[in-house]
Amino acid sequence: MSDSLSRRAFTQLVGAAAVTGALPRALSANTPAMSGPDLTPDDELTSLSATELAARIRRKSVSAREVLEAHLARIERVNPTVNAIVTLVPEQARAWAKAADERQARGEPLGPLHGLPIAHKDLVDTAGIRTTKGSLLYKDNVPTTDALIVQRIRAAGAITIGKTNTPEFGAGSNTFNAVFGATRNGFNLQKTVGGSSGGAACALNCNLLPIADGSDTGGSLRNPGAWNNIVGFRPSPGRVPDDDGSWSPLSTSGPMARSVEDVALFLSAIAGVHAPDPTSLTDDPSLFRRPLAASMKGKRIAWFTSMGGLPFEPEITRVLNANRQAFIDMGCIVEDAEPDFSGVDDAFPTLRHLTYHTSYAKLNRDNPTLFKDTVKWEIAEAERQGAVDVARANARQAQMYRHVQQFFAKYDAYVCPVTQVEPFDITTEYPTRVAGVAMPTYIDWMRSAWYVTFMQCPAISVPAGFSASGLPVGAQIVGRPRGDWALLQLAHAFEQATAHGKRRPDFA
């Protein structure tokens, strides 16, 4: 596999860039949130938090239709530059927003996301709205039913406006594909947004949406969260059930937003038991709408040292470690300590390969020229490994979970970097070296994220500051098994203490 894009994908990427026209200036590391004479009334609405927007709609100080039109206007102005939202259904959205306002006028019960616009990751099925999965095989695919997460989001009152960009079949952490091209980072338009929920994270960062859904196997909620200075939350396995029948603790859907409070609000709409999924958790999801503020005094924090010897770019560790004092100032007890990650290098890829083989092996056999090399590699590796390899991986996964329970008997949370590198050039598919160390495959450079996946715990990416080059860095906070609420409280306290997440690209 090459470290550059395939000719087909690269041509598509460059083509997408060509139609954007002149590029606006990007935000420097010291630029505050959007402000000044160029700020329009629409921009003021789109910069509000999801929680505040929802409250204003309930108070009838603004309507769902007004909120929708503000976001559509901003999408029209900004999205051609960043390519975050790849399918837009404005007329359908207007009809849904009108119906939402009419329900409110009749005094009907309103869901927690009432009137909030949202675009769904282009991996999940949306009835009547094109769902491409970033693949030419599905470029004209229009599902007839909604995925479970979309059903729950709509039932909670949100207004679907379209789909967000993703790599082909969600493989990789550079959001580009042959259908729509690449998504660009608002802080530096020559850099990637990460992936695979890159379109969603970019849309949030650029105030195109107040909330967005994503999914995560090896970091796909957390990596783009870090690189777009927003919050990406990977919930506990089973917290947000899926209807694909896989029941794997490796992959989960989850919420993304510009604040921890908004993530918690969103989680309250998509969490909850789903009878056909035996792994789904039964906790009342409305509990995630409680106030997050709480004292962190006495909380014991395990602080990252090297995650078992992983290489990190110096700016990643510098920015993260600069936040250690913030936890101490919050009253936490911070000490160097890490889980035992031995054996994860073999076990996680083994189980990951199986998921790709199950989903795409037959399609690849029938359409080999329409699959990118990294997906083909996943399928080939699954066919190379044997039953003993899978059994060992499953055993290591069970062993890891027992170890994690012992680890968190002493600590309330573990803090480590989300990524090992800063956002890289958009014309690079994946880094082949990190801090001088070779990365043989396209997933090796993301071990800091998928090591945490293997812990089977909730994990959140929260803005941690900016590198010397002006690019965002995320802090990854990992909570106890099924301790999603306590983790959100800690992340909220850190967010309030630092305010790193206030910075946004300054598109005039």
Task: Give the positions of each predicted feature.
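Gly/Ser-rich catalytic/binding loops embedded in alpha/beta enzyme cores
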Residues: V14, L23, A33-G218, N321-Q325, ...
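A short helix-breaking turn/cap at a secondary-structure junction
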Residues: S28-L39, D43, P109, I230-N323, ...
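Short helix-loop capping/hinge segments that flank enzyme active sites or metal/cofactor-binding pockets
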Residues: L113-K133, R290-T305, L351-Q405, P417-V421, ...
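N-terminal secretory signal peptides and thylakoid transit peptides that target proteins
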Residues: M1-A17
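Acyltransferase
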Residues: A64-E69, K98, L287-P291, P314-E338, ...
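Short glycine/serine-rich loop segments
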Residues: T145-H274, T453-G474
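Glycine-rich, small-residue loops and helix-cap segments
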Residues: K60, G115, A155, I159-I161, ...
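Residue-level signal for inorganic ion chemistry
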Residues: H71, A93, V263, I301, ...
